[in-house]
């Protein structure tokens, strides 16, 4: 089945794209998109408008993630080449010289939204939602998604979409400057498209116009400078320094707004390749592919076991004289949730002055290793398999997602290293 279909009515061509197939790193999709743009360029003098819509069937996200998870550092050059070719196709679309209008309905996510941003006008239905969720998978958006969103909305208004992976309603997207109009129904949308074409709308992106100014203030304006002074610290506070993607996105936004558009695309591609091949992205992508019923009795029982292990270790640390503030800081450094309150039967702090106080690193590792050891005990007992254990530990118990989960944490550290560190912490590891 073709990923792109066209229908011509006089001087207007309507293009329908399979949203699930839009992939900047797919040679097959690039060939079809390139053939479409070749056709549009060849007929340019006979056309007065292009309307692009999207089939919004569920995307086969797992297939794309498997491809991304296979990326290695050695393939970074090939990745940059593919992205450069795709960026070139979108630039040809937005410099076509005739109006290109995107009509949007339902969920418009990821690369489908990225392609829509390369159109000169975007009109959506009221129920549509818009998101660039790549940050949740440890990656930066790519293929102009950062450069275009930041230039259309301005630095601050684009942050929820880019840095948080938030889903914007049609009204929010309109207010942010990502849409030009919102229609109540399909008929209303058709009327808005017709009026836009009849009004001889400019076939030009704002940043390609000489008089373009960044919405919300230039980078050297007082409000934006104030925002940039606190934004990095706010990101680190939110992520604990464990998620490189949000900081990479912010860097791509700011650096890209200081240069011409084509250079901004290159900067964005570099940050994507850097984050996509990172262990954090690989772990987050793997977690997203695990299928597990988190509401099942087995998942609930395992989660309860982990919570008890966490509470037990925090009580043991309190008994070793570790203060509440130090416990909280160590848990945060590990990427774990705040320690639970002391249990009713918790031992009082030790009065043995000769016993050395645990170091900060030891406290952090004891919290992590307590959960990892309890996880492997449950896996060994057949209570849960390792994939389910990883997902439950992250989603229900707050084990740091960047590690890939409590079972995967041991694989990452290495079984021998894990056993040695457990021994150094005086924590007897379960059978590995």
Predicted features by range, described:
Residues 1-16, 114-118, 160-271, 284-299, ...:
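Amphipathic alpha-helical segments at domain termini/boundaries
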């Amino acid at each position: 089945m073709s990923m792109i279909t066209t229908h011509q009515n006089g001087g207007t061509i309507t293009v329908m794209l399979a949203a699930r197939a839009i992939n900047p790193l797919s040679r097959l999709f690039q060939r079809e998109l390139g053939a479409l743009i070749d056709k549009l360029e060849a007929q340019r003098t006979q056309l007065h408008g292009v309307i692009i819509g999207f089939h919004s069937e569920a995307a086969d996200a797992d297939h794309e993630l498997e491809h991304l998870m296979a990326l290695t550092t050695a393939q970074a050059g090939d990745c940059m080449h593919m992205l450069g070719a795709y960026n070139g196709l979108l630039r040809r679309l937005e410099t076509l010289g005739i109006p290109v209008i995107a009509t949007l309905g339902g969920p418009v996510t990821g690369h489908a939204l990225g392609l829509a941003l390369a159109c000169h006008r975007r009109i959506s239905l009221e129920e549509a939602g818009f998101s660039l969720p790549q940050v949740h998978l440890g990656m930066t958006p790519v293929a102009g998604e950062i450069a275009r969103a930041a230039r259309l909305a301005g630095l601050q208004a684009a942050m929820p979409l880019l840095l948080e992976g938030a889903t914007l309603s049609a009204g929010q997207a309109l207010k942010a400057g990502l849409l030009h109009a919102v229609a109540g129904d399909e008929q209303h949308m058709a009327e808005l498209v017709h009026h836009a074409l009849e009004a001889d709308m400019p076939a030009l992106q704002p940043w390609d116009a000489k008089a373009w100014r960044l919405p919300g203030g230039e980078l050297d304006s007082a409000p934006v400078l104030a925002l940039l002074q606190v934004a990095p610290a706010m990101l680190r506070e939110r992520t604990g320094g464990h998620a490189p993607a949000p900081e990479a996105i912010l860097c791509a936004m700011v650096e890209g707004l200081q240069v011409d558009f084509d250079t901004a695309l290159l900067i964005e591609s570099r940050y994507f390749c850097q984050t996509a091949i990172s262990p954090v992205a690989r772990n987050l992508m793997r977690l997203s592919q695990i299928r597990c019923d988190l509401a099942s009795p087995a998942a609930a029982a395992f989660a309860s076991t982990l919570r008890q292990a966490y509470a037990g270790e925090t009580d043991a640390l309190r008994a070793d004289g570790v203060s509440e503030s130090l416990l909280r800081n160590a848990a945060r450094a590990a990427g774990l949730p705040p320690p639970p309150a002391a249990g009713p039967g918790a031992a009082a702090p030790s009065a043995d002055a000769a016993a050395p106080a645990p170091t900060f690193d030891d406290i952090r590792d004891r919290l992590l290793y307590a959960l990892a050891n309890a996880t492997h005990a449950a896996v060994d007992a057949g209570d849960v398999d390792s994939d389910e254990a990883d997902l439950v530990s992250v989603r229900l118990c707050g084990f740091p997602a960047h590690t890939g989960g409590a079972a995967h944490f041991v694989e990452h550290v290495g079984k021998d290293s894990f056993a040695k560190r457990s021994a150094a912490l005086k924590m007897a590891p379960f059978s590995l």
